[in-house]
């Protein structure tokens, strides 16, 4: 009984005297087989692409953050305390704001992140996704900036070009109250394969970010990377 459907199908498929019908059956069967094979292939490719994209994004962003104005001396003490937890793989101070990136006549709204490259490697794999320059280019005295490849394409930018960053904080000058602005040099371009990041995120050094925002010797918080992202809530509760 289990093979009755297969038996009937094969009988009609192999039947003699109806060559044209048998040919049609063969073509139909081949078409279905090819269609199913293509569907399986496309589904596998899409699932693999989605998995790779999620992995890239999750590895490039921290699992948790402690927010609040924290002095750089407090960062060291807090970091030492957090690292006592065996589930904490790394920590990194950060500064975060929003602003405008200006290049010639083009303006683009961006998320601005001040990071310390030395610590950022402990919470993010973004350094592995640079197509030009590196995250280490943010170290040093220059006002350097790294951006995503989509943003670079949209504004026609490459390594070595200069851009202006405008932030909502204001400065009082001869012309009155103006948005605070500073010129930066593009020293790196990354590509995570995630459009929401590659076209909207820019990174600079925490020292330059604190000067731009005039927040003194402090940061906006600490980002944390755990051994298991999906247990991050439990780890945070234990740390607190």
Question: Can you annotate each of these PLM segments?
Answer:
Residues 1-36:
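N-terminal Sec/SRP start-transfer signal
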Residues 37, 41-111, 121, 132-141:
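Hydrophobic, regular-secondary-structure patches
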Residues 63-65, 144, 221-223:
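Short aromatic/hydrophobic contact patches that present stacked aromatics
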Residues 78-83, 126, 235-240:
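Short amphipathic alpha-helices in soluble, non-transmembrane regions
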Residues 89, 98-184, 211-213:
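Short acidic/glycine-enriched loop/turn elements at secondary-structure junctions
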Residues 169, 177-240:
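Mechanotransmission and gating elements of multispan inner-membrane complexes involved in transport
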């Amino acid at each position: 009984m289990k093979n009755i459907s297969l038996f009937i199908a094969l009988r009609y498929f192999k039947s003699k005297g109806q060559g044209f019908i048998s040919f049609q059956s063969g073509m139909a069967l081949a078409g279905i087989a090819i269609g199913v094979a293509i569907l399986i292939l496309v589904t596998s490719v899409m699932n693999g692409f989605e998995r790779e994209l999620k992995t890239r994004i999750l590895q490039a962003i921290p699992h948790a953050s402690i927010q609040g104005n924290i002095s750089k001396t407090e960062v060291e003490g807090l970091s030492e305390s957090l690292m006592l937890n065996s589930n904490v793989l790394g920590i990194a101070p950060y500064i975060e704001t929003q602003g405008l990136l200006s290049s010639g006549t083009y303006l683009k709204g961006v998320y601005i992140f001040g990071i310390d490259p030395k610590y950022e490697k402990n919470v993010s794999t973004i350094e592995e996704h640079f197509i030009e320059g590196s995250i280490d280019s943010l170290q040093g005295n220059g006002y350097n900036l790294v951006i995503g490849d989509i943003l670079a394409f949209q504004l026609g930018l490459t390594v070595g070009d200069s851009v202006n960053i405008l932030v909502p904080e204001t400065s009082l000058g001869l012309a009155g109250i103006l948005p605070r602005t500073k010129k930066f040099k593009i020293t790196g371009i990354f590509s995570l394969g995630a459009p929401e990041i590659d076209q909207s995120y820019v990174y600079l050094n925490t020292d330059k970010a604190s000067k731009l925002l005039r927040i003194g010797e402090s940061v906006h918080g600490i980002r944390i990377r755990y051994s298991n992202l999906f247990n991050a809530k439990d780890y945070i509760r234990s740390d607190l």
